[in-house]
Curated annotation (Swiss-Prot):
N-terminal signal peptide: none
Family (UniProt): Belongs to the ABC transporter superfamily. Beta-(1-->2)glucan exporter (TC 3.A.1.108.1) family.
Binding site for ATP: 368-375
Transmembrane regions: 22-42, 55-75, 156-176, 248-268, 276-296
UniProt-listed Enzyme Commission number(s): 7.5.2.3
Location in or out of the cell: Cell inner membrane
GO molecular function terms noted in the UniProt entry: ABC-type beta-glucan transporter activity; ATP binding; ATP hydrolysis activity; ATPase-coupled lipid transmembrane transporter activity
Pfam families with a match to the protein in the record: ABC_membrane, ABC_tran
Primary localization class, coarse: membrane
Protein name as catalogued: Beta-(1-->2)glucan export ATP-binding/permease protein NdvA
Domain remarks: In NdvA the ATP-binding domain (NBD) and the transmembrane domain (TMD) are fused.
Taxonomic path: Bacteria, Pseudomonadati, Pseudomonadota, Alphaproteobacteria, Hyphomicrobiales
Length: 599
């Protein structure tokens, strides 16, 4: 993307506040025109002194214009600051909202810290560009576009000096941009690596401390910082060279203006006041050209991070739904997968031609080896991504024709990892339904067998649970996850084997809460333990993305197929004469002992 396109796209974010932006632009143009008039008036003051004429009138006009310029500059600075701050926060919030709608696979591939770093650095760069655009860039362009014609009307010969100076600045800027483009992109990559390392080590600080990795991780950060310096310094060298060349050109131009002016005055071809005006023009032009050079430096520096941000914005924009999309209402829970196919890009994994039907209130257990496609089915149900072929219908409605918001409102999920926020207990439960009353929150906690342990905490329901629930035990975290699902009270329930990671005693305590939660709801269980599937109305055995077997527990157990093999491998005897089989390699189903069996 060219530098001009990057700049233009950055400015488009200001269109949300069109009136305020136009006001700032008009004010900036006025400031530029007033600034341009100052050297002319100052030259007239000097000429009046030289001619011993009326000094008061031009001096008063010059002072009045200067006072207006000061007030206008304050107005522009104040308005530009406020507008730029508002838009930075606005863009950050809008982009954040789109980011958290992206599928989990997208975040896993990109990296959470990478997306966060891109967002923060890009919005900071946008803020700087917006602020400088309203404060300086626009006034600089207007001043330069007006200054040369005005100067040419006064004296063509002296104007050539200013034109040559402008050409030199442009040539130096183009040279440096060409030399630093790749280097600045490399700098941005090193910034990401450094930030990712910091984020990674801090999020795993317990491992760092436990394994005495503090010194080694700090040294690794030093190495990343050194690599960043090594990439940054060549870029800085080019800009330092540009600054020196620009300063040399501007100084030489001032000398030429003074020499030519003195020569023309002695020859009677120019007045002293006109020479003073041209000196003011030269100083003004040098200042504006320096601002342009700084602007180019800022834009080139921001180029890589803004390009990455725009790519991220384009990727997330594809997830936006039309405003008039229909909602899914009055869900009963009849679910049909009709020849559903989805394959992950460049992976060869997915689900293929999967068909089954679930009646309202039925429980479906999904089992199979790791990577079989169990979670993919659930993600398709929740429209984390849409099928490449086939369709998924809820109560006869294709899920692609309804809003994701209404679809997910109809589905409550209890993950194996509870996924708690660093907020109070009540706030975490209220994730299920934001407008729930205190009484409803407490009722959900009681139904999840969580009320007693919550009251035992020092601050009860106001107790903060720590990052990802670190201040709670595994059982306590899961009970809060179940409580928020109860509070959501959705007709469709997804259980990612919510108790499989718990000890037997804690699991038994939660079983009743889970059973109560799934009662009279269409329930999907991603099963990691065979004991979970016994009461399921429908068992789906997935392998390599295909639905290999489906039926009730007893039907599949007696069929003698893959599911039956899995039962034997887990230690369950269908018949006394059948020997115990080894565990199926790659299976996600955890064997459990049979009562009375010898281990």
């Amino acid at each position: 993307m060219s530098l001009l396109k990057i700049y233009w796209r950055a400015m488009q974010y200001l269109a949300v506040e069109r009136t305020a932006t136009i006001t700032m632009c008009v004010a900036s143009v006025l400031v530029a025109l007033v600034t341009l008039a100052e050297p002319v008036l100052f030259g007239r003051v000097i000429q009046s002194i030289s001619d011993k004429g009326d000094i008061f009138s031009p001096l008063l006009m010059w002072a009045a214009l200067g006072g207006f310029n000061i007030m206008a500059a304050v107005f522009v600075a104040r308005g530009a600051d406020r507008l730029a701050h508002r838009r930075r926060l606005g863009v950050m919030i809008d982009s954040y909202e789109r980011l958290i709608t992206m599928p989990l696979a997208w975040h896993q591939k990109r990296g959470t810290s990478n997306a966060l770093h891109t967002l923060i650095r890009a919005t900071d760069s946008l803020f700087t560009l917006w602020l400088e655009f309203m404060r300086q860039h626009l006034t600089t362009v207007v001043a330069l576009a007006t200054l040369i014609p005005v100067a040419m009307t006064m004296d063509m010969r002296m104007s050539l000096v200013l034109i040559v100076l402008g050409v030199i600045y442009v040539m130096i800027g183009q040279l440096v941009m060409r030399k630093t483009k790749d280097g600045q992109a490399a700098v941005e990559k090193h910034h990401h690596k450094l930030f990712e390392h910091v984020s990674d080590t801090i999020s795993n600080v317990s491992v760092v401390q436990s394994y005495n990795r503090i010194a080694s991780e700090t040294q690794a950060l030093r190495d990343y910082a050194k690599n960043l310096e090594n990439a940054q310094f060549p870029v800085l060298n080019w800009w330092a060279l540009a600054s020196g060349l620009n300063r040399m050109a501007s100084t030489f131009s001032m000398v030429v203006v003074l020499v030519l002016g003195a020569y023309f005055v002695t020859k009677g071809q120019m007045r002293v006041g006109d020479v003073i005006a041209f000196i003011g023009f030269a100083q003004l032009m040098i200042g504006r050209l320096d601002q342009i050079s700084a602007f180019i430096n800022q834009t080139v520096t921001a180029r890589a991070k803004l390009e990455e941000f725009f790519q991220m914005e384009d990727a997330t924009a594809d997830r936006q739904e039309p405003e008039n999309v229909a909602d899914l209402n009055d869900v009963k829970g009849d679910i049909v997968f009709d020849n559903v196919t989805y394959e992950f890009p460049n992976s060869g994994q997915g689900v293929y031609d999967v068909s089954f039907e679930v009646k309202p209130g039925q429980t479906v257990a999904i089992v199979g080896p790791t990577g079989a496609g169990k979670t993919t089915l659930i993600n398709l149900l929740q429209r984390v991504f849409d099928p490449a072929a086939g369709r998924i219908m809820i109560d006869g409605t294709d899920t692609r024709t309804v809003s994701r918001r209404s679809l997910r409102h109809a589905i409550a999920t209890v993950f194996q990892d509870a996924g708690l926020f660093n907020r109070s207990v009540e706030d975490n439960i209220r994730v299920g339904r934001a407008n729930a009353t205190h009484e409803e929150v407490h009722a959900a906690a009681k139904a999840a067998a969580a009320h007693d342990f919550i009251l035992a905490k020092s601050e009860g329901y106001d107790t903060f649970v720590g990052e990802r629930g670190s201040q709670l035990s595994g059982g306590e975290r899961q009970r809060l996850a179940i409580a928020r699902a109860i509070l959501k009270d959705s007709p469709i329930l997804v259980l990612d084997e919510a108790t499989s990671a718990l000890d037997v005693e804690t699991e038994e305590k939660l079983k009743q809460a889970v059973d109560e939660l799934s009662h009279n709801r269409t329930t999907f269980i991603i099963a990691h333990r065979l004991s979970t599937v016994r009461s399921a109305d429908l068992v789906l055995f997935m392998d390599k993305g295909h639905l290999v077997e489906s039926g009730s527990f007893n039907e599949l157990a007696e069929r003698g197929g893959r599911f039956s093999d899995l039962l034997r491998a887990g230690g369950l005897k269908l018949e006394d004469k059948q020997p115990k089989q080894p565990v199926v390699e790659g299976s996600n189903v955890m064997p459990f002992p049979v009562k009375g069996a010898v281990a």
